[in-house]
UniProtKB/Swiss-Prot annotation:
This is 4-hydroxy-2-oxovalerate aldolase. Keywords: Aromatic hydrocarbons catabolism, Lyase, Manganese, Metal-binding. Mn(2+) binds at D23, H205, H207. It comes from Mycolicibacterium gilvum (strain PYR-GCK) (Mycobacterium gilvum (strain PYR-GCK)). The keyword Manganese applies. The record marks R22 as: Transition state stabilizer. The active site is at H26. InterPro entries: 2-IPM_HCS-like, 4OH_2_O-val_aldolase, Aldolase_TIM, DmpG_comm, DRE_TIM_HOA, PYR_CT. Belongs to the 4-hydroxy-2-oxovalerate aldolase family. PROSITE patterns: PYR_CT (PS50991).
Amino acid sequence: MSTEDIYFNPIWDVRMTDTSLRDGSHHKRHQFTKDEVGSIVAALDAAGVPVIEVTHGDGLGGSSFNYGFSKTPEQELIKLAAETAKESKIAFLMLPGVGTKEDIKEAQNNGGSICRIATHCTEADVSIQHFGLARELGLETVGFLMMSHTISPEKLAKQARIMADAGCQCVYVVDSAGALVLEGVADRVSALVAELGDDAQVGFHGHENLGLGVANSIEAVRAGAKQIDGSCRRFGAGAGNAPVEALIGVFDKIGVKTGIDFFDIADAAEEVVAPAMPAECLLDRNALIMGYSGVYSSFLKHAIRQSERYGVPAHQLLHRAGQRKLIGGQEDQLIDIALEIKREQEAEATRA
């Protein structure tokens, strides 16, 4: 698969994608308004952000009982983003089994030009048809190997090869739980770079659950990653994503060219993105437990909701989710865990 038609300015060392309007949807419980999306896209575009991702937190078709309903239909937000951006390309996420081929076509018709297809890191084979369709439609393609911390670099590279052979132009090491630590990122990115060669680029998507989003992203770039994700103000699931404004500051200092103006992106984060956030993304006990136990970052809000519903500690829910090795799409099992903890509490109270 050729990487020649990837949107990549020769002056860049790395292409940045801001995921505030997709990963940030988890933190906002998918309640973005058109005004918020329009203002954020305009600010990111003006700062020089090459790619802006816009969709429900769980991708196309994610608005549902299981994941949470969108306040504004995602296709309307994709269209608005594409109409607002002057230079930035609009990307959209889709998960096989959640989104459909019709969703992909509609997103393209609404102005999306980069299709990012995500699977669990051991299930790349379920994305083959989706990559084929996206390339047939003329879309640029990106693959997400989620929960990449759960398998070895060698196994991850084999999964990346499946995506690349199917038409994926850049395969991401996705640290969905924010559980990877420095060398763990470098080893995985290096393995993918060695496997894919010129067939596809390699990217990295980090979270801040152990406070390593920026450091891990630097490790990824030094290991050969050409695409990096982040969110302004860490606006994302769990403790949030690597903050774009901090990434740009660090990249400037170490000589990594991105085409993004540091002062403009810092202004966008402070003056435009922050007011749209329901609260800051915190590196609190719940987030730390997710990073430490390897829990999918979008579980945070679901765990808090079940904690309030059943009167059990959210951090205990998250820790047990990690022990069970739950993955994205299994959020409903938090109810079973909550009931399990509740029964244990009642039994202990009876013994007392």
